[in-house]
């Protein structure tokens, strides 16, 4: 049985751990709020670009952008968004499990995959399983910049525009609320004109504002479509990173709260054991004193 001194040492260690996890929980709360603001701020831009591109495409049905064409190549691109750090529960595990299942399905269908890793955890995992990583970006910090994302992602976008890959998928964790995040594996390319138009109409219905799109575009509508669709895809990737960061801090906050609560429970149990050990020691000493006094009296 552990001595009182050993138990006191364990209690002290767990109290130190509890302070650390509590501090990390509070930091995650602050970072999560900022990440949520950044995530919400990015949505209107992507929506507006999509609306303009969708209506331009509807007005010019004869023009089909490279991102809307269907390629027959036996190669698929995949953008995997994970975190740079751990201690966020099963967030990365769930995303990487989804990616692994997709890669397995592609292999069964006789197709290969080229991946782009955003985040250190995904980059390390993809290398370990032998996936082909054509580009990556890590250490984005708490404020991701689009400029750092464009280069790695452009590798797949250019390959799709050249017809070298048949589709591009995007995998990340979508932020629902503080307690719930969902893994998303969605097709990024080819873009669907019908889907973009449906989302535009839904957005306009929700906002109650119908727009007139009788504009004059310079130098011409096709050049504007080319630029807007690239910006739209980049905005979707940025939005996924912002969603993933909000999910990361929410998951870390929950994980650290659970760790703090568990540390508190262990401390309570150790204090109970310590008190019982101390009580047993005191009882033993009293018994020895009483026995000694009885022996002297006899």
From Swiss-Prot:
Where it sits in the cell: the answer is:
Cell inner membrane
- Methyltransferase as a keyword of this entry, yes or no, is no
Record SUPFAM superfamilies: ATP synthase (F1-ATPase), gamma subunit
Q: Does the keyword Cell membrane apply?
A: yes
Q: Name one Pfam family in it.
A: ATP-synt
InterPro entries linked to this entry: ATP_synth_F1_ATPase_gsu (IPR035968), ATP_synth_F1_gsu (IPR000131), ATP_synth_F1_gsu_CS (IPR023632)
Q: Name one GO cellular component term.
A: proton-transporting ATP synthase complex
* Tree of life domain: Bacteria
- The principal location of this protein is membrane
Q: Which GO terms describe its biological process?
A: proton motive force-driven plasma membrane ATP synthesis
Q: What does this protein do?
A: Produces ATP from ADP in the presence of a proton gradient across the membrane. The gamma chain is believed to be important in regulating ATPase activity and the flow of protons through the CF(0) complex.
Q: Quote the PANTHER family the UniProt record gives.
A: ATP SYNTHASE GAMMA CHAIN (PTHR11693), ATP SYNTHASE SUBUNIT GAMMA, MITOCHONDRIAL (PTHR11693:SF22)
Subunit annotation: F-type ATPases have 2 components, CF(1) - the catalytic core - and CF(0) - the membrane proton channel. CF(1) has five subunits: alpha(3), beta(3), gamma(1), delta(1), epsilon(1). CF(0) has three main subunits: a, b and c.
Query: Which family does the UniProt entry place this protein in?
Result: Belongs to the ATPase gamma chain family.
The name this protein carries in UniProt is ATP synthase gamma chain
* Species of provenance: Albidiferax ferrireducens (strain ATCC BAA-621 / DSM 15236 / T118) (Rhodoferax ferrireducens)
Taxonomic placement: Bacteria, Pseudomonadati, Pseudomonadota, Betaproteobacteria, Burkholderiales
Originating gene: atpG
């Amino acid at each position: 049985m552990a001595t009182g001194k050993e138990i006191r040492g364990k209690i002290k260690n767990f109290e130190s751990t509890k302070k650390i996890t509590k501090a990390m929980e509070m930091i995650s709360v602050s970072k999560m709020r900022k990440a949520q603001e950044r995530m919400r701020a990015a949505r209107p831009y992507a929506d507006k670009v999509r609306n303009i591109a969708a209506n331009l495409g509807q007005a010019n049905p004869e023009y089909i952008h490279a991102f809307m064409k269907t390629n027959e190549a036996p190669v698929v691109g995949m953008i995997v968004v994970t975190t740079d750090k751990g201690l966020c529960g099963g967030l990365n595990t769930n995303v990487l499990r989804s990616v692994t299942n997709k890669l397995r399905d592609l292999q069964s269908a006789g197709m290969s995959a080229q991946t782009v890793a955003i985040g250190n955890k995904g980059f390390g995992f993809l290398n370990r399983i032998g996936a082909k990583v054509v580009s990556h970006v890590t250490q984005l910090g708490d404020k991701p910049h689009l400029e750092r994302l464009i280069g790695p992602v452009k590798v797949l976008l250019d390959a799709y525009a050249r017809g070298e890959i048949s589709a591009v998928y995007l995998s990340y964790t979508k932020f629902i609320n503080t307690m719930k995040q969902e893994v998303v594996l969605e097709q990024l390319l080819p873009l669907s004109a019908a889907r973009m138009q449906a989302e535009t109409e839904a957005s306009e219905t929700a906002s109650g504002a119908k727009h007139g799109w009788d504009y004059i575009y310079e130098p011409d509508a096709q050049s504007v479509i080319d630029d807007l669709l690239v910006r739209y895809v980049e905005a979707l990737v940025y939005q996924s990173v912002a969603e993933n960061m909000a999910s990361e801090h929410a998951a870390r906050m929950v994980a650290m709260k659970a760790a703090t609560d568990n540390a508190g429970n262990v401390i309570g149990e150790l204090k109970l054991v310590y008190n019982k050990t101390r009580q047993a020691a005191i009882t033993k000493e009293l018994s020895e004193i009483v026995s000694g006094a009885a022996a002297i009296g006899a």
